[in-house]
Amino acid sequence: MKQIVYVASPESQQIHVWQMDNQGALTLLQVVDTPGQGQPMVIHPARTHLYIGVRPSFGVVSYRIDEKGLLTEAGMAPLPGSPTQLTTDLQGETLYSVSYSGSCLSVSPIDEQGIVGAPTQTLEGLTHCHSANVDTTNQVLWVPCLQEDRIRLYTIGEAGHLTPRTPEALDSVAGAGPRHMVFHHGGGYAYAINELSGTVNVIAIDAAGAGPRIVQTLDIMPAGFSDTRWAADIYITPDGRWLYCCDRTASVISRFAVSEDGGVLRLLGHQATESQPRGFNIDSQGRFLVAAGQKSHHIAVYAIDAQSGALDPLARYAVGQGPMWVSVLAR
């Protein structure tokens, strides 16, 4: 299986394209200059296109991915606010973009050629929304709003159109600052990382038919940590056994064991990583983790131990300036 790693570095306005071999070693294939500061990326479910949000001219760039994993720009469409995170629905027909600074969420069509068009719907007043997350049924969009301390919930309708659900939101603890999310492959649980409190919530998606409910909250920080918490990203391995979170102040990745049904997390330890890890990702087989250091201007590759989930450092690679986002393509 061929795997390609894409790293977005907004300060140098670049995407570095790497091929990953079966041992986790990377070979640089391409450096793409982006039309502006590119930050959030997402790969089309069909693995034919990569999308990146850019600023200061707010927009999303569509890139075609060839058989080698190389990128060719294929189009650009406007966005209503500075893009913070992008996602697509599971069919690859709609792209959702959230803007933290603009406190808005936009819905954009993806045509049959895989090119993103102009937004057809914009929801405003989502105070400091930080991500949009499509559930495993492709029917519900979860939108953590950091300053509101809640996750808003929307039903996904025809052409990706969004309507508020009932209940319309899941409240977090005051001051938590919900940021990013992932879902357990079984569909019963979700996990949300809280930026300001440095915690992770386990969410029962439909607790006894009454809607979502937080069933566990765990600290992601090392014992005795007393500095400002600044949690950033969260990912789970494809088999649902291991979950990872990162914090930018401590520059660590925390590791959790996930119960078989997904409903319980257990903190196992912490791995020191690149300075200010804004983003990371896991390969499609759950064997490797790639973390980007926003201040170190490097990425680090770790092997994931199949028995313990522990991270074994393999190598570091220089990338562009201020890397913030990592996406992994499997072919």
UniProtKB/Swiss-Prot annotation:
This is 6-phosphogluconolactonase. It is an enzyme of class 3 (hydrolase). The gene is pgl. Pathway: Carbohydrate degradation; pentose phosphate pathway; D-ribulose 5-phosphate from D-glucose 6-phosphate (oxidative stage): step 2/3. One of its GO terms (cellular component) is cytosol. It catalyses: 6-phospho-D-glucono-1,5-lactone + H2O = 6-phospho-D-gluconate + H(+). Keywords: Carbohydrate metabolism, Glucose metabolism, Hydrolase. One of its GO terms (biological process) is pentose-phosphate shunt, oxidative branch. InterPro entries: 6-phosphogluconolactonase_YbhE, Cycloisomerase_2, Lactonase_7-beta_prop, N2O_reductase_N, WD40/YVTN_repeat-like_dom_sf. Catalyzes the hydrolysis of 6-phosphogluconolactone to 6-phosphogluconate. Its EC number is 3.1.1.31.
